[in-house]
Amino acid sequence: MSATLALTEQLIARASVTPDDQHCQQIMTERLAALGFECETIASHGVTNLWAVKRGADGRDGKLLAFAGHTDVVPTGPLEQWTSPPFVPAHRDGKLYGRGAADMKTSLAAFVVASEEFVAAHPGHRGAIAFLITSDEEGPATDGTVKVVELLEARGERVDYCIVGEPTSTAELGDVVKNGRRGSMSGELVVKGVQGHIAYPHLAKNPIHLLAPALAELAAEQWDAGNEYFPPTTWQVSNLHAGTGATNVIPGHADLMFNFRFSTASTVEGLQARVHAILDKHGLEYTLKWSVSGLPFLTPRGDLSNALENAIRAETGLTTELSTTGGTSDGRFIARICPQVIEFGPPNGSIHKIDEHIDVRFVDPLKNVYRRVLEQLIA
């Protein structure tokens, strides 16, 4: 069994359901400390975070390449639906099964072993290697990566490149990497009406009827046309509720929850202003609470994307696709302190599902791609 596969199994065996790290980071810290990494645990409200760094010959003047990832996994769901226990690594038909196999314990193991091999081959490496690991990526993400980033900002720590080990591949390892993500902003809208008996509508004010024209306009609005890197911004309703459940009561208010996934072609302030303008145009009496969970970020072609594309081509023969599709990731926080952030990991077809797994044939090639990137950028 390869070193990468063995470490992957060791991590899968820890039932690290968010935000419980279950000592996964301790396992990683022991390996990294043996390489000369300075390891710092940063705890916050039950969340465990790790910042580990190994300086190179150039000291703080050298380029720093960070690997960002998470040890937490999503809940298993009904255990009886799993073919084998989710936290007992199992091999079937060339695949390794277990919660976190794809998202993202294989990536964690691969970069640890890649770092071990790189340091052994390049003991005098010039640049620095760092790990930014959290147990709060699958949960609220309020005490994880963002807290470490705030600490690094306060210290004036510079991060030149960051690989986030999210499972970005689709059919084959390396066919897709993410060089950016859309922003995410949600709204909670309450439209006020006047409750009353449904037989006496002249004595009431139906908030559903009031909201409907504005809702139709919001749904039909083209917020932007996207750009070279991002598709157009989308607006979607996630929840709509009004009434008591009775058939003879006009409700006193209608509640709507919605979400924007927005590109760099739009801004938070611009989108909010346009929503308010539409609601005001329809004369609604309302309250609207906004929450922004992430801003869009984009890494244009540069040293990191070139190194990753070269490494993937050398290891797999594939020409990778740079993409910004999908949901948010912790890359949105890291982009605040790092100009080049790219996500790359194994295929994502089974993530968050019963019987999550990874094809074993991708495990060591993933490690090799990571090692090749280290060699190109900081050797």
UniProtKB/Swiss-Prot annotation:
SUPFAM superfamilies given in the database record: Bacterial exopeptidase dimerisation domain, Zn-dependent exopeptidases
Active site: 72, 137
Annotated binding of Zn(2+) 1, by residue: 70, 103, 166
EC number: 3.5.1.18
One of the GO biological process terms: lysine biosynthetic process via diaminopimelate
Binding site for Zn(2+) 2: 103, 138, 352
Pathway note: Amino-acid biosynthesis; L-lysine biosynthesis via DAP pathway; LL-2,6-diaminopimelate from (S)-tetrahydrodipicolinate (succinylase route): step 3/3
Cofactor binding summary note: Binds 2 Zn(2+) or Co(2+) ions per subunit.
Origin superkingdom: Bacteria
Molecular functions per Gene Ontology: acetylornithine deacetylase activity; cobalt ion binding; succinyl-diaminopimelate desuccinylase activity; zinc ion binding
Top-rank EC class of the record's enzyme: hydrolase
Alphabetically ordered keywords of this record: Amino-acid biosynthesis, Cobalt, Diaminopimelate biosynthesis, Hydrolase, Lysine biosynthesis, Metal-binding, Zinc
Subunit-level organization: Homodimer.
PANTHER family: ACETYLORNITHINE DEACETYLASE, N-ACETYL-L-CITRULLINE DEACETYLASE
Family (UniProt): Belongs to the peptidase M20A family. DapE subfamily.
Role description: Catalyzes the hydrolysis of N-succinyl-L,L-diaminopimelic acid (SDAP), forming succinate and LL-2,6-diaminopimelate (DAP), an intermediate involved in the bacterial biosynthesis of lysine and meso-diaminopimelic acid, an essential component of bacterial cell walls.
Protein name in the entry: Succinyl-diaminopimelate desuccinylase
Organism: Burkholderia ambifaria (strain MC40-6)
Gene of this entry: dapE
